[in-house]
């Protein structure tokens, strides 16, 4: 190995990116929709890499102008999903063709089951020496009678692979004021107190707010579709799970407004349900 080869190395990596799905090729409508979405979402998506999905658009797209609009909102475009002339034009503008995959849901925790009654007493493991075959023992010059064969001791049951403990939840024990933003990377977020209007709570896992949720909440920030939002008092500006979000422009139904609630993703639809007290 030469000295030069030590200057870099290749490693596999998984990159999370926002998927921006185009339904129109008209630049004015696209930029207006982008401005509105980013105004609604605040800083949720800022500095997140973007893959532009133009697979549903046949008309030609002004790629340089669209990419400039995305960068203007601190959304760096890195890839494209498209076909034909739009794919070629996007690649000419500097995007790489990518294939999209659905992010896996968080694996369910392992559940231990009690062994049956007749197997409650564990069988001790047999030492390795007891399984070896050796020459028979002798007394004097007379050959010894072969010892009666003993039944082989049962082997110890294979142990299940160790499951790493999940990261501890990030717990915030004070109210969050307008303009404050908290992000729990690779874990759940628990806020004990109020999330004020203009504040943002984000987690790769679940979001729990034990108090009024009046700001913006996003669970499953890295694409976990099984993540959920829980709050004891729902009055949010924006709710999002795995990138699917809902801006709360009008007051929620009386069965949900200022009530304990659960927010989760059902396919591509964001569901908001009241929690029974």
Curated annotation (Swiss-Prot):
Pro residues compositional bias, start-end: 145-164
Pfam family, one: MinC_N
Protein name, per record: Probable septum site-determining protein MinC
Organism the protein comes from: Bordetella petrii (strain ATCC BAA-461 / DSM 12804 / CCUG 43448)
Similarity remark: Belongs to the MinC family.
This protein's record includes keyword rRNA processing: no
Function in brief: Cell division inhibitor that blocks the formation of polar Z ring septums. Rapidly oscillates between the poles of the cell to destabilize FtsZ filaments that have formed before they mature into polar Z rings. Prevents FtsZ polymerization.
HAMAP family linked: MinC
Highest rank taxon of the organism: Bacteria
Assembly mode: Interacts with MinD and FtsZ.
InterPro entries the record matches: CAP/MinC_C (IPR016098), MinC (IPR013033), MinC_C_sf (IPR036145), MinC_N (IPR007874), Septum_form_inhib_MinC_C (IPR005526)
Region named Disordered: 137-164
Record's keyword terms, sorted: Cell cycle, Cell division, Septation
């Amino acid at each position: 190995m030469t000295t030069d080869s030590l200057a870099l190395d290749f490693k596999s990596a998984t990159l999370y990116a926002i998927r921006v799905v185009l339904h129109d090729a008209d630049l004015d409508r696209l930029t207006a929709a982008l401005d509105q979405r980013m105004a609604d979402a605040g800083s949720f998506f800022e500095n997140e890499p973007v893959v532009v999905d133009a697979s549903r658009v046949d008309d030609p797209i002004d790629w340089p102008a669209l990419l400039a609009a995305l960068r203007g909102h601190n959304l760096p475009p890195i890839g494209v999903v498209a076909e034909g002339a739009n794919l070629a034009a996007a690649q000419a503008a500097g995007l790489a063709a990518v294939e999209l995959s659905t992010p896996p849901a968080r694996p369910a925790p392992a559940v231990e089951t009690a062994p049956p009654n007749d197997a409650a007493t564990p069988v001790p493991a047999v030492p390795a020496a007891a399984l070896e075959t050796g020459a028979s023992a002798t007394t004097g010059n007379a050959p010894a009678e072969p010892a009666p064969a003993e039944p082989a001791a049962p082997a110890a049951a294979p142990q299940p692979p160790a499951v790493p403990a999940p990261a501890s939840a990030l717990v915030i024990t004070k109210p969050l004021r307008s303009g404050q933003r908290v992000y729990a990377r690779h874990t759940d977020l628990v806020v004990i107190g109020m999330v004020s209007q203009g504040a943002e709570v984000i987690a790769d896992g679940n979001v729990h707010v034990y108090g009024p949720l009046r700001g913006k909440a996003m669970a499953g920030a890295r694409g976990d579709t099984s993540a959920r939002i829980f709050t004891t008092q729902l009055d949010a500006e924006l709710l999002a799970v795995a990138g699917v979000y809902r801006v709360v422009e009008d007051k929620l139904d009386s069965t949900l407004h200022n009530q304990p609630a659960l927010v989760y993703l059902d396919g591509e639809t964001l569901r908001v349900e009241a929690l029974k007290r």
